[in-house]
């Protein structure tokens, strides 16, 4: 067992969750700040911290009122302590620490990225150690080796932008607004529909792709992501086009992003051997990317685990899912203090 109250505030989502055994979500109220940040074209850290400060109390009250929790009822309190916006992290940490004291429960700090990778547990899956973890979000694009609970090692990282950041910046270039990922996907789907391309057959148009292949000559001894070149190519194509076909630009840009990600995953499987793959992070809400990853994993004959759509983006339930791995394996979390860095530590 393990009844947990969890807190998430690493960026622009304020989340509190009551989770049993790191798997069954009892309640998970969430406040999204997207509408608040949209006029600025991105996240304003100070505004994010203030919003967390305002929203944690009503979200927490919602859970406490509905479930009548008393001191001694919780097995632990979990909270994201890194990486993220330092002010936002501190708001969540102080809220969690106060609750841990009130409920007389231990506080377990969690790495935000390990929480994303643990989100598959909320859908009834166990984390299949050893495994590969593909993390794709607004701030991170990397592949990890999951050795055992509390032991995650970086296999390959991004040289510049993250995938989610590349999509957000592309949407800005094309005048589609924030957040960029869903906007790019919508316009790409519209273009495919206009050309009679059904899901799963997007490669039929690859000969028309106006963008260069990203890092076509990959190093064979390591995995690397890089999205700055394709972003620059999009800007040049947009500025030089006499007639700006936004749908076409979005479609071919998305195709190159997806191709780059899947080539890197394929490369990682060749290096590390056939291991189950856990793919996580907000970018995994992209249906085109999901289909491509499924194809690569079928080719290698390995299992692909992706969280449900609602658990792909930041939420507190995934924080409890990650903390449960420490709790049930009697491990001490190495993430007890708040930091902005994203380095993994061993338990």
Question: Where do the language-model regions lie?
Answer:
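Conserved phosphate-binding catalytic cores of ATP/NTP-utilizing and phosphoryl-transfer enzymes
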Residues: 1-2, 109-131, 322
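N-terminal beta-alpha supersecondary unit
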Residues: 2-73, 79-83, 112, 116
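Short beta-strand scaffold segments in enzyme catalytic cores
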Residues: 14-19, 133-135, 141-145
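Short Gly/Thr/Asp-enriched flexible loops that form oxyanion-binding sites at enzyme active sites
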Residues: 79-104, 287-295
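Conserved phosphate-binding/catalytic loops in two-lobed NTP-binding clefts
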Residues: 109-110, 294-319
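Glycine-rich phosphate-binding/hydrolytic loop that grips phosphoryl groups
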Residues: 116, 307-347
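Glycine-rich phosphate-binding loop plus the immediately following alpha-helix
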Residues: 125, 148-189, 232, 236-242
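A contiguous, well-structured pocket-lining segment that forms one wall/lid of small-molecule binding clefts
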Residues: 187-193, 204-277, 286-300, 327-330, ...
């Amino acid at each position: 067992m393990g009844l947990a109250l969890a807190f998430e505030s690493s960026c622009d989502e304020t989340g509190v969750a009551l989770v049993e055994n790191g798997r069954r979500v009892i309640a998970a109220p969430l406040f999204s700040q997207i509408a608040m940040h949209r006029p600025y074209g991105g996240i304003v850290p100070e505004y994010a911290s203030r919003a967390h400060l305002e929203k944690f109390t009503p979200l927490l009250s919602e859970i406490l009122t509905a479930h009548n929790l008393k001191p001694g009822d919780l097995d632990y309190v979990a909270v994201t302590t890194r990486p993220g916006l330092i002010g936002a992290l501190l708001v969540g940490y102080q809220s969690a620490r106060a609750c841990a004291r009130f409920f007389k429960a231990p506080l377990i700090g969690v790495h935000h990225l390990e929480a994303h990778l643990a989100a598959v547990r909320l859908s009834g899956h166990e984390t299949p150690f050893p495994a590969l973890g593909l993390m794709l979000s607004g701030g991170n694009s990397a592949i990890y080796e999951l050795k055992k609970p509390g032991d995650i090692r970086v296999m390959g990282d991004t040289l510049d932008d993250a995938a989610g950041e590349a999509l957000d910046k592309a949407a800005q270039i094309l005048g589609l607004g924030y957040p960029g990922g869903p906007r790019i996907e919508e316009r790409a789907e519209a273009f495919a529909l206009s050309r009679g391309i059904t899901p799963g057959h997007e490669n039929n148009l690859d000969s028309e792709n106006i963008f260069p292949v990203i890092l076509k000559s990959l190093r064979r001894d390591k995995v690397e992501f890089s999205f700055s070149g394709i972003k620059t190519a999009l800007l040049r194509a947009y500025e030089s086009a006499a007639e700006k076909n936004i749908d076409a630009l979005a479609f071919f840009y998305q195709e190159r992003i997806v191709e780059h990600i899947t080539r890197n995953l394929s490369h990682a499987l060749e290096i590390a051997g056939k291991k189950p793959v856990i793919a996580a992070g907000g970018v995994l809400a992209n249906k085109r990317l999901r289909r491509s990853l499924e194809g690569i994993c079928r080719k290698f004959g390995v299992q692909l685990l992706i969280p449900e759509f609602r658990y792909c983006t930041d939420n507190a339930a995934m924080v409890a899912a990650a903390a449960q791995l420490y709790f049930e394996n009697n491990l001490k979390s190495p993430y007890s203090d708040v930091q902005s860095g994203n380095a993994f530590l061993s338990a």
